[in-house]
Design a protein with these regions (language model features):
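Beta->alpha turn/N-cap motifs
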Residues: 1, 29, 48, 141-146
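Ligand/substrate-recognition segments at binding pockets and active sites
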Residues: 73-146, 157, 171
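Extracellular/periplasmic solute-recognition and catalytic clefts
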Residues: 1-11, 34
Length: 188
């Protein structure tokens, strides 16, 4: 299973690509693997796990808190901002992950309140919404896997604009008409 941090693109400040990039630079992924997973994980540098046919390495985005602070300043958040991070899991490892993320983001001025969600609460808060404007999610730690090794079964559910809650799991509320067309065309 590939775990990831969803950033709700519908709302500020996460609608700004510079903020999303800053968060990526603010997190020391190698240290996260050591601290939260005791070394039993591998940082991923793309949307598809490296084992998937056709997976493209998009990074790495090295740990660079100075670059993160610069991007936040460019985006209009020189002093950072406050937000909430929900975990879709309430186990010990996930607790370590969100605590680590909270500490890393604090170093660049992003104050994060964390909450580990019980499964029923997660479903209610994440999936039982009327649409993007109704969502209370801002940062969401979750995972996704597909045993078929069909990239469509990864990309469509979590990134296609028609798959936003309450329909399915595009909890980033990512919406890009060109991307949707490419995903749809790839099925033909």
């Amino acid at each position: 299973m590939q775990k990831h941090l969803d950033l709700n693109n519908f709302f500020k400040p996460f609608s700004d690509n510079r903020v999303r990039q800053a968060i990526n630079y603010a997190i020391n992924k190698d240290a996260l693997v050591k601290v939260a997973y005791n070394g039993y994980a591998v940082p991923q540098y793309g949307i598809l796990a490296s084992q998937y046919p056709g997976a493209v390495k998009l990074g790495p985005w090295p740990y660079n808190p100075q670059k993160a602070r610069e991007l936040l300043k460019e985006a209009g958040y020189p002093n950072g901002f406050s937000t909430i991070l929900w975990s879709g899991y309430n186990d010990t490892t996930s607790g370590k992950v969100v605590q680590f993320l909270q500490q890393q983001l604090a170093q660049v001025g992003i104050k994060v309140e964390t909450k580990l969600l019980e499964p029923g609460v997660r479903t209610e808060l994440i999936l039982h919404v009327k649409g993007a404007a109704d969502s209370k999610s801002r940062l969401f730690y979750i995972g996704w896997s597909d045993g078929s090794f069909d990239p469509d079964q990864v990309l469509r559910p979590i990134l296609h604009s028609t798959q936003q809650p309450p329909v399915y799991m595009n909890t980033t509320y990512y919406a890009n008409k060109h991307f949707d067309e490419l995903i749809d065309k790839a099925l033909v």
